[in-house]
């Protein structure tokens, strides 16, 4: 459950399992705080991480027929959508918009090399950067005590805060992006 920046609507996921032989299916919906004006935003069996860009638009890693799995920017209460980061964001991640709405940051789950990747992307001109690779000990891979990066912006848009176990224990780290974001 995530409220829009103006508090007028919220996102929620509806997850179900048709039978025990298949995986979970997920769709994303929005509604007013009183539960009225429900709108199905994405209904093609898979939605993962999501964030409000502004009171009307939602970025989500989801599936669309004929396209596949991508980050899509959906306009709430409409059928409008656009792909964000085509060819750059290739896997699901914890996505977040900068306070000014100009930049998207996302992480990845660790690969076989036990490295999380942290990416920054500006849709306006397709500027994109890998900000770093962060080690996660193999013994926590896929376990409840794993540590995803979960990037979050400082209010001034000059730094990102991430969770990481790159030093051997779970810590918070600041990543200075001011030279990129202005």
Model-identified regions with their sequence ranges:
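Beta-propeller blade-edge and WD-like acidic-aromatic loop motif
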Residues: 13-41, 56-58, 63-83, 109-136, ...
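Conserved beta-propeller blade repeats
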Residues: 1-11, 38-61, 88-107, 137-155
């Amino acid at each position: 459950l995530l409220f829009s920046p103006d508090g007028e609507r919220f996102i929620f996921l509806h997850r179900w399992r048709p039978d025990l032989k298949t995986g979970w299916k997920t769709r994303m919906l929005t509604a007013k705080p009183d539960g009225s004006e429900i709108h199905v935003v994405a209904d093609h069996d898979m939605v993962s991480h999501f964030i409000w860009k502004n009171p009307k638009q939602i970025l989500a890693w989801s599936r669309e027929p004929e396209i596949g799995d991508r980050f899509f920017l959906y306009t709430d209460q409409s059928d409008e959508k656009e792909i964000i980061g085509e060819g750059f964001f290739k896997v699901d991640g914890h996505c977040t918009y900068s306070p000014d709405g100009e930049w998207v940051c996302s992480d990845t789950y660790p690969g076989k090399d036990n490295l999380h990747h942290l990416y920054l992307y500006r849709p306006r001109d397709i500027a994109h950067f890998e900000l770093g690779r962060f080690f996660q000990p193999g013994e926590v891979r896929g376990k409840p005590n794993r540590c995803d990066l979960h990037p979050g912006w400082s209010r001034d848009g000059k730094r990102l805060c991430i969770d990481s176990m790159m030093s051997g224990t779970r810590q918070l780290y600041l990543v200075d992006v001011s030279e990129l974001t202005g």
